[in-house]
Every structure is written in structure tokens, then in C-alpha cells.
Amino acid sequence: EVGHRYVLNATSAEVLDTAARGETHPIIPSYVDYETYVSEGGYKLLGDLRAGRIGKEDILKVLDDSSLRGLGGAGFPTGRKWRAVLGEPGPRLMAVNGDEGEPGTFKDRFYLLRDVHRFLEGTLIAAHIIDAEDVYIYLRDEYPAALKLLPLEIAKLPAGGPRIHMRRGAGAYICGEETALFESI
């Protein structure tokens, strides 16, 4: 990596040439932008939820029926977790952990760079369900293209949702662990 530009199959000569050309900024790959996502039906579910055409309990039932579980190791049911959050007094904040540190794991990066609005709509649906006033998206430092892309696309979102804050990880696997992540935010 030169600056924040990945150099695939890097040789000493290629790294030196990249630096000499001043190519240090991350390359953002082609992705589904806001306009395309909306034209293909994106944000419809969020709009229906916010307008009251779909209730929070409807979404929670879908989560329960799907048996969707967290991937943090315990496999905790997502619907049950969201209900537990709703049972706590506000104000509520939400943290989205994009600091995947497991060797060879790049699923978060893939969605953040290719289908960013699917990620954002899911985030905003979750925030709406649990009545979160603020959302903190925690991304690993090794994802410079995602760190550059997300604020650009977040700025395109219509007003009316929770405040979205970006936080850059400290670059160590332990930062993705829940309590360390909260301390870092």
C-alpha cells in the first residue's frame, strides 16, 4: 500500500513508480450509487416503515421467523436483541461494527464498496426499529476506500433519520471486540 492506494502484486519498482506518480489516494470501485439504488426500489422498505405502512413489530416478526442471528460468535437472535434494546430507557445509540479482523474475511468491505446503500438502508431500518438517535459506523483503518466512499453517499441521504457518525478503527483486531469498540468510539 502506498499512502492509501493498494498496489496489487507489488514489486519494489511498482511501489516506487506508484509513489513517484503521486497515486496515494484509495481507488473507489464501481458501486451501486444512491440514484441507482432508489431507481431499483431501494429505501422503499425504510420509507414504508417511517410512514407507518409497516410496523416495527412486523419487521421484528420477520427477523424472528427468519432465525437471523448475529455473527459475533454467540449467534444471538437479532429480533430478540433488538427487543432487548427497546426495553431499555433512551436515549439510544447504535454502533455498526465494520472492523472485521478475522483472517481472510472481507464481507463488510465488499458490501461497503459495492452495495453501500443496501448497507445504509439496513442500518437505518435497525436504527428506526430501536429508536436510535445516533448511529456510529466503526470501520477498520485498512479500508480507506470505504472510509472515503461512505461519507459521500451518506451526504446523499434525505434528512429525517438519525445522525450518522463515522469512526475509524485503530487498526488492531481487538478493536472489533464489543467493549473495545465502544471504548474506541
Regions found by a protein language model. Name each.
Residues 1-185:
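Feature of Fe-S/electron-transfer and energy-metabolism proteins
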